[in-house]
Amino acid sequence: MTTASQTPVGDGPGPRNAAPAGDGPGTSGPVPAGSHGPGRRRSAADLRALAEEAGERFADATAEEVLTWAAEEFGDALAVACSMAGDTVLPHLVAGVHPGVDVLFLETGYHFAETLGTRAEIGTVLPVTVIDVLPRLTVAQQDEQYGTDLFSRDPGACCALRKVEPLGRELAGYEAWVTGLRREDNALRRHAQLVEWDNTHHMVKLNPLAGWTFDDVIAYAGRHGVPINPLLTDGYPSIGCEPCTRRVEPGEDPRAGRWAGLAKTECGIHL
Protein backbone atom coordinates (compact mmCIF):
# COMPACT_ATOMS: atom_id res chain seq x y z
CA MET A 1 0.00 0.00 0.00
CA THR A 2 1.28 3.45 -0.90
CA THR A 3 0.35 6.17 1.54
CA ALA A 4 1.59 9.61 2.43
CA SER A 5 3.47 8.29 5.44
CA GLN A 6 5.19 5.59 3.41
CA THR A 7 6.01 7.62 0.32
CA PRO A 8 7.24 11.01 1.46
CA VAL A 9 9.17 13.51 -0.59
CA GLY A 10 12.82 13.12 0.31
CA ASP A 11 14.21 10.52 2.71
CA GLY A 12 12.74 8.86 5.76
CA PRO A 13 9.16 8.60 7.02
CA GLY A 14 6.79 11.47 7.46
CA PRO A 15 3.83 13.19 5.82
CA ARG A 16 4.12 14.23 2.21
CA ASN A 17 3.68 17.97 1.96
CA ALA A 18 3.53 20.34 -0.98
CA ALA A 19 5.99 22.97 0.17
CA PRO A 20 5.01 26.52 -0.74
CA ALA A 21 7.53 27.41 -3.44
CA GLY A 22 7.67 28.69 -6.99
CA ASP A 23 5.15 30.63 -9.03
CA GLY A 24 2.09 29.96 -11.17
CA PRO A 25 1.34 27.16 -13.62
CA GLY A 26 2.82 26.59 -17.04
CA THR A 27 1.20 24.74 -19.91
CA SER A 28 3.82 22.07 -20.54
CA GLY A 29 7.40 21.18 -19.77
CA PRO A 30 9.32 20.61 -16.51
CA VAL A 31 7.59 20.16 -13.18
CA PRO A 32 6.77 23.60 -11.73
CA ALA A 33 8.28 24.35 -8.33
CA GLY A 34 5.83 23.52 -5.56
CA SER A 35 4.06 20.67 -7.38
CA HIS A 36 4.37 16.92 -6.86
CA GLY A 37 3.06 16.17 -10.34
CA PRO A 38 5.25 14.81 -13.14
CA GLY A 39 4.77 17.90 -15.31
CA ARG A 40 2.66 18.41 -18.41
CA ARG A 41 3.54 16.63 -21.64
CA ARG A 42 0.81 18.24 -23.72
CA SER A 43 -0.03 21.83 -24.54
CA ALA A 44 -3.11 23.56 -23.20
CA ALA A 45 -4.63 23.45 -26.68
CA ASP A 46 -4.17 19.68 -26.90
CA LEU A 47 -5.61 19.16 -23.42
CA ARG A 48 -8.59 21.35 -24.19
CA ALA A 49 -9.36 19.41 -27.37
CA LEU A 50 -9.09 16.18 -25.39
CA ALA A 51 -11.45 17.50 -22.69
CA GLU A 52 -14.05 18.63 -25.21
CA GLU A 53 -14.01 15.31 -27.08
CA ALA A 54 -14.17 13.27 -23.87
CA GLY A 55 -16.92 15.49 -22.50
CA GLU A 56 -19.16 14.47 -25.37
CA ARG A 57 -18.08 10.83 -25.37
CA PHE A 58 -18.63 10.33 -21.63
CA ALA A 59 -21.69 12.55 -21.17
CA ASP A 60 -23.77 9.60 -19.95
CA ALA A 61 -20.98 7.38 -18.61
CA THR A 62 -20.60 5.94 -15.13
CA ALA A 63 -18.00 7.23 -12.69
CA GLU A 64 -16.02 4.02 -13.16
CA GLU A 65 -15.98 4.38 -16.96
CA VAL A 66 -14.75 7.96 -16.81
CA LEU A 67 -12.03 7.15 -14.30
CA THR A 68 -10.83 4.08 -16.20
CA TRP A 69 -10.34 6.27 -19.26
CA ALA A 70 -8.62 8.99 -17.22
CA ALA A 71 -6.18 6.56 -15.61
CA GLU A 72 -5.21 5.17 -19.01
CA GLU A 73 -4.97 8.61 -20.64
CA PHE A 74 -3.10 10.53 -17.94
CA GLY A 75 -1.39 8.02 -15.65
CA ASP A 76 0.63 9.82 -12.98
CA ALA A 77 -0.38 13.18 -14.47
CA LEU A 78 -3.81 12.58 -12.89
CA ALA A 79 -4.51 13.92 -9.38
CA VAL A 80 -7.51 13.74 -7.06
CA ALA A 81 -8.58 16.76 -5.00
CA CYS A 82 -10.23 15.52 -1.82
CA SER A 83 -11.58 17.68 1.01
CA MET A 84 -11.98 14.63 3.28
CA ALA A 85 -15.59 15.72 3.70
CA GLY A 86 -18.29 14.33 1.40
CA ASP A 87 -15.86 13.14 -1.25
CA THR A 88 -13.81 10.36 0.36
CA VAL A 89 -15.34 7.89 -2.09
CA LEU A 90 -13.26 9.60 -4.79
CA PRO A 91 -9.87 8.23 -3.67
CA HIS A 92 -11.44 4.78 -3.40
CA LEU A 93 -12.90 4.98 -6.91
CA VAL A 94 -9.69 6.24 -8.51
CA ALA A 95 -7.44 3.84 -6.60
CA GLY A 96 -9.45 1.01 -8.12
CA VAL A 97 -8.09 1.89 -11.57
CA HIS A 98 -4.90 3.75 -10.61
CA PRO A 99 -3.40 2.58 -7.28
CA GLY A 100 -1.04 5.06 -5.68
CA VAL A 101 -2.74 8.09 -7.23
CA ASP A 102 -1.84 11.46 -5.70
CA VAL A 103 -4.67 12.74 -3.49
CA LEU A 104 -4.41 16.47 -2.80
CA PHE A 105 -5.68 17.68 0.57
CA LEU A 106 -5.78 21.43 1.18
CA GLU A 107 -4.38 21.74 4.69
CA THR A 108 -5.71 25.19 5.55
CA GLY A 109 -4.93 25.09 9.25
CA TYR A 110 -8.60 25.61 10.10
CA HIS A 111 -10.08 22.13 9.66
CA PHE A 112 -12.42 20.30 12.02
CA ALA A 113 -10.68 17.60 14.06
CA GLU A 114 -13.01 15.10 12.36
CA THR A 115 -11.73 16.16 8.94
CA LEU A 116 -8.11 15.68 9.95
CA GLY A 117 -8.98 12.29 11.41
CA THR A 118 -10.63 11.28 8.14
CA ARG A 119 -7.57 12.42 6.19
CA ALA A 120 -5.34 10.25 8.37
CA GLU A 121 -7.62 7.25 7.94
CA ILE A 122 -7.84 7.58 4.15
CA GLY A 123 -4.06 7.77 3.92
CA THR A 124 -3.77 4.60 5.97
CA VAL A 125 -6.44 2.28 4.56
CA LEU A 126 -6.48 3.15 0.84
CA PRO A 127 -3.70 2.56 -1.73
CA VAL A 128 -3.24 6.27 -2.42
CA THR A 129 -0.63 8.95 -1.77
CA VAL A 130 -2.15 11.77 0.28
CA ILE A 131 -0.36 15.09 -0.20
CA ASP A 132 -0.96 17.94 2.24
CA VAL A 133 -1.07 21.06 0.07
CA LEU A 134 0.10 23.97 2.22
CA PRO A 135 -0.48 27.73 1.97
CA ARG A 136 2.56 29.96 1.71
CA LEU A 137 1.74 31.42 5.14
CA THR A 138 1.02 29.59 8.37
CA VAL A 139 -2.06 30.72 10.27
CA ALA A 140 0.18 32.67 12.65
CA GLN A 141 1.99 34.37 9.77
CA GLN A 142 -1.31 35.22 8.10
CA ASP A 143 -2.63 36.70 11.35
CA GLU A 144 0.51 38.82 11.66
CA GLN A 145 0.35 40.06 8.07
CA TYR A 146 -3.41 40.48 7.61
CA GLY A 147 -4.75 40.64 11.16
CA THR A 148 -6.42 37.91 13.18
CA ASP A 149 -9.46 36.02 11.92
CA LEU A 150 -9.22 37.13 8.30
CA PHE A 151 -11.89 34.51 7.57
CA SER A 152 -14.49 36.60 9.43
CA ARG A 153 -13.52 39.96 7.90
CA ASP A 154 -12.71 38.93 4.33
CA PRO A 155 -13.50 35.25 3.73
CA GLY A 156 -12.76 35.60 0.02
CA ALA A 157 -9.21 36.71 0.73
CA CYS A 158 -8.73 33.94 3.29
CA CYS A 159 -9.90 31.28 0.83
CA ALA A 160 -7.63 32.73 -1.86
CA LEU A 161 -4.61 32.51 0.42
CA ARG A 162 -5.31 29.13 1.99
CA LYS A 163 -7.07 27.22 -0.81
CA VAL A 164 -7.09 28.79 -4.26
CA GLU A 165 -3.43 29.76 -4.63
CA PRO A 166 -1.99 26.58 -3.06
CA LEU A 167 -4.18 24.32 -5.21
CA GLY A 168 -3.30 26.20 -8.39
CA ARG A 169 0.39 25.85 -7.59
CA GLU A 170 0.04 22.12 -7.00
CA LEU A 171 -2.16 21.41 -10.04
CA ALA A 172 0.41 23.02 -12.34
CA GLY A 173 2.32 19.72 -12.40
CA TYR A 174 -0.63 17.60 -13.58
CA GLU A 175 -2.68 17.37 -16.77
CA ALA A 176 -6.01 16.40 -15.21
CA TRP A 177 -7.68 16.52 -11.83
CA VAL A 178 -10.63 14.69 -10.30
CA THR A 179 -13.12 16.57 -8.12
CA GLY A 180 -16.11 15.67 -5.96
CA LEU A 181 -18.48 18.22 -7.51
CA ARG A 182 -22.12 17.07 -7.49
CA ARG A 183 -24.90 18.81 -9.40
CA GLU A 184 -27.27 18.69 -6.46
CA ASP A 185 -24.94 20.77 -4.27
CA ASN A 186 -26.19 24.15 -5.50
CA ALA A 187 -27.25 26.08 -8.60
CA LEU A 188 -23.67 26.96 -9.55
CA ARG A 189 -22.81 23.27 -9.90
CA ARG A 190 -26.01 22.18 -11.63
CA HIS A 191 -24.40 21.97 -15.07
CA ALA A 192 -21.16 20.21 -14.09
CA GLN A 193 -20.08 17.70 -16.74
CA LEU A 194 -18.34 14.40 -16.13
CA VAL A 195 -15.38 15.61 -18.19
CA GLU A 196 -14.80 19.29 -18.95
CA TRP A 197 -12.17 21.90 -19.67
CA ASP A 198 -10.85 23.84 -16.67
CA ASN A 199 -10.15 27.28 -18.07
CA THR A 200 -8.67 28.50 -14.79
CA HIS A 201 -5.97 25.85 -14.44
CA HIS A 202 -5.70 25.05 -18.17
CA MET A 203 -6.20 21.34 -17.69
CA VAL A 204 -8.79 18.58 -17.92
CA LYS A 205 -11.30 18.44 -15.06
CA LEU A 206 -13.24 15.31 -14.15
CA ASN A 207 -16.38 15.32 -12.01
CA PRO A 208 -17.27 11.61 -11.81
CA LEU A 209 -19.75 12.18 -8.97
CA ALA A 210 -21.65 14.91 -10.83
CA GLY A 211 -24.82 12.85 -11.07
CA TRP A 212 -24.59 11.31 -7.61
CA THR A 213 -26.79 12.28 -4.68
CA PHE A 214 -25.75 12.59 -1.05
CA ASP A 215 -27.46 9.25 -0.40
CA ASP A 216 -25.50 7.68 -3.28
CA VAL A 217 -22.24 8.75 -1.65
CA ILE A 218 -23.19 7.38 1.77
CA ALA A 219 -24.45 4.12 0.25
CA TYR A 220 -21.25 3.60 -1.78
CA ALA A 221 -19.08 4.27 1.26
CA GLY A 222 -21.09 1.75 3.26
CA ARG A 223 -20.89 -0.97 0.60
CA HIS A 224 -17.15 -0.61 0.15
CA GLY A 225 -16.10 0.25 3.69
CA VAL A 226 -14.79 3.69 2.72
CA PRO A 227 -14.12 5.96 5.72
CA ILE A 228 -16.39 9.01 5.77
CA ASN A 229 -16.21 12.19 7.76
CA PRO A 230 -18.49 11.61 10.79
CA LEU A 231 -19.79 15.18 10.50
CA LEU A 232 -21.60 14.20 7.28
CA THR A 233 -24.24 12.32 9.23
CA ASP A 234 -24.32 14.90 12.03
CA GLY A 235 -25.94 17.76 10.14
CA TYR A 236 -23.01 18.81 7.95
CA PRO A 237 -23.68 17.66 4.35
CA SER A 238 -21.03 20.15 3.20
CA ILE A 239 -17.89 20.60 5.28
CA GLY A 240 -15.26 23.29 4.98
CA CYS A 241 -13.06 25.07 7.49
CA GLU A 242 -14.46 24.98 11.02
CA PRO A 243 -14.87 28.77 11.53
CA CYS A 244 -16.89 29.08 8.31
CA THR A 245 -19.16 26.01 8.54
CA ARG A 246 -22.36 25.42 10.54
CA ARG A 247 -24.97 22.69 10.66
CA VAL A 248 -27.61 22.71 7.91
CA GLU A 249 -31.27 22.84 8.91
CA PRO A 250 -33.84 20.47 7.35
CA GLY A 251 -34.90 21.71 3.91
CA GLU A 252 -31.92 24.00 3.44
CA ASP A 253 -29.51 23.86 0.50
CA PRO A 254 -26.76 21.32 1.26
CA ARG A 255 -24.18 24.14 1.19
CA ALA A 256 -26.25 26.58 3.27
CA GLY A 257 -23.95 25.97 6.21
CA ARG A 258 -20.93 27.35 4.36
CA TRP A 259 -20.24 31.06 5.02
CA ALA A 260 -23.74 31.36 6.50
CA GLY A 261 -25.20 34.85 6.29
CA LEU A 262 -22.93 35.88 3.43
CA ALA A 263 -23.47 35.94 -0.33
CA LYS A 264 -20.40 33.73 -0.67
CA THR A 265 -21.18 30.07 -1.55
CA GLU A 266 -17.90 28.87 -3.07
CA CYS A 267 -14.30 28.98 -1.85
CA GLY A 268 -13.11 29.73 -5.37
CA ILE A 269 -11.32 26.58 -6.47
CA HIS A 270 -14.13 25.67 -8.88
CA LEU A 271 -14.70 29.17 -10.29
Language-model regions: role of each:
Residues T2-L271:
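Nucleotide-activated chemistry modules centered on ATP-dependent adenylation/adenylyltransferase
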